[in-house]
Amino acid sequence: MRTLYPEVTPFEHGILCVDDNHRLYYEQCGNPHGKPVVILHGGPGSGCNDKMRRFHDPDKYRIVLFDQRGAGRSTPHANLTNNTTWDLVADIEKLRVALGITRWQVFGGSWGSTLALAYAQTHPEQTTELVLRGIFMLRRWELEWFYQEGASHLFPDAWDRYIAVIPPVERHDLISAFHRRLTSEDEATRLAAAQAWSLWEGATSCLYMDQDFIASHENPHFALAFARIENHYFVNGGFFEVENQLLRDAQRIANIPGVIVHGRYDVVCPLQNAWDLHKVWPKASLKITPGAGHSAFEPQNIDALVCATDSFV
């Protein structure tokens, strides 16, 4: 079974100003003359971490990572102004041009898969391959499954902690109830809601619970960006024209090679998502990992993703 490549240090990092407000942190790792790949983190709002550098062979790939608007080391932190899917798609292009890259592989999981599909469908000529994990397409049923009722029946203990910050009278629409608190003028209200929202996803992302991983979701800096930006996208339907837009426009990536990796026991983003995508994008190979959940860092998901990136060099 394949594991992550060894730790790697960026050979370059910087800040890209994408408008009058947003400044995005980016970094490059691996071989400056290697095959380019851009890594798209999840959330939206989670930001990149050092382990995300390690799915690609650093001797063969030029690995580009960046923190999306409001996330991680990008500023202003947790900001929702001009923060939409299509702003992020445009940011990816601005970064590609700024780095002098003609075409690149696009790698992303969870929300990163959403953004990767949106980017590739908008800029297929700049996309050499897609490597996707934990498919998420922001359809209404997906949001209701995880944030209203569905996953709640599998993790009732974590669910009770998630809904504790919302009065019973508001629990018929939890995404909206959290939105009111995450955009509150009161800092304590925002933080309490952000930590509850963030911990819910942390508690459900792995087949076998990882307490350190769960605890990381309670960090105030992480939780505020993660929860505020995620919720902002969800109340706006991902800023898509129609909820099945990524499936509707799949013909735009029909000729792009791809690999879809999805955990059989992914509770956050059910396997149905990958199945639906594969049916309209048969050129991609679908790898269902039989002993994994949602997290990219579960052993079987790591194995499948590293095998996928190796196959393209």
From Swiss-Prot:
Its main location: cytoplasm. Signal peptide: none annotated. Residues 35-298 form the AB hydrolase-1 domain. Coiled coil: none annotated. This is Proline iminopeptidase. It comes from Xylella fastidiosa (strain 9a5c). Its EC number is 3.4.11.5. GO terms for biological process: proteolysis. It is an enzyme of class 3 (hydrolase). It comes from the Bacteria. Specifically catalyzes the removal of N-terminal proline residues from peptides. Keywords: Aminopeptidase, Cytoplasm, Hydrolase, Protease. It catalyses: Release of N-terminal proline from a peptide. GO terms for cellular component: cytoplasm. Belongs to the peptidase S33 family. GO terms for molecular function: aminopeptidase activity. PANTHER family: PROLINE IMINOPEPTIDASE (PTHR43722:SF1). The lineage of its organism: Bacteria, Pseudomonadati, Pseudomonadota, Gammaproteobacteria, Lysobacterales. The keyword Glycosyltransferase does not apply. The gene is pip. It is found in: Cytoplasm. The active site is at 110 (nucleophile), 266, 294 (proton donor).
